[in-house]
Amino acid sequence: MPRKGPVPKREVLPDPIYSSRLITKFVNRLMYDGKKGAAEKIFYSSLEHLAEKTGEEPMRAFEKALDNVKPHMEVKARRVGGATYQVPMEVRPERQVSLSIRWLINYARSRGEKGMTAKLSAELLDAFNGRGGAVKKREDTHRMADANKAFSHYRW
């Protein structure tokens, strides 16, 4: 922990096409070895494909896909008297966004399609329709929180 007070949040610049900070965060998370151009190319083509399939505006379709993956509750380990309890906690909005982005990208990478563009667009389309790996992860997280509701009084 820093002694000089809280560390300031770094400002993320909005992306050039849609002027969205959310897209910039997604692209930065998608990027490997500092190759932002390649990550942007993959993302924008996936977004166009998503808009084509859904018939909605690209940004709106992306936001809906992200909303379908955002977790509202999660469990955190808490030690009480030698026992570790999984305590359900609410997820902060900032963490909701970062978790949903992380899950979407991880499950897109583990898909069977050929090429990252196809993988990402398929995962985004599945998330838009309320299915797929990332949505399943969210459901599992909510199920865990629901199962451990008895330990919610250990919240800190």
Swiss-Prot record:
PROSITE patterns: RIBOSOMAL_S7 (PS00052). This is Small ribosomal subunit protein uS7. HAMAP family: Ribosomal_uS7_B. It comes from Desulfovibrio desulfuricans (strain ATCC 27774 / DSM 6949 / MB). Part of the 30S ribosomal subunit. Contacts proteins S9 and S11. Belongs to the universal ribosomal protein uS7 family. The keyword Ion transport does not apply. Pfam families: Ribosomal_S7. The keyword S-adenosyl-L-methionine does not apply. The lineage of its organism: Bacteria, Pseudomonadati, Thermodesulfobacteriota, Desulfovibrionia, Desulfovibrionales. The gene is rpsG. SUPFAM superfamilies: Ribosomal protein S7. InterPro entries: Ribosomal_uS7, Ribosomal_uS7_bac/org-type, Ribosomal_uS7_CS, Ribosomal_uS7_dom, Ribosomal_uS7_dom_sf. GO terms for biological process: translation. Gene3D superfamilies: Ribosomal protein S7 domain. Keywords: Ribonucleoprotein, Ribosomal protein, RNA-binding, rRNA-binding, tRNA-binding. One of the primary rRNA binding proteins, it binds directly to 16S rRNA where it nucleates assembly of the head domain of the 30S subunit. Is located at the subunit interface close to the decoding center, probably blocks exit of the E-site tRNA.
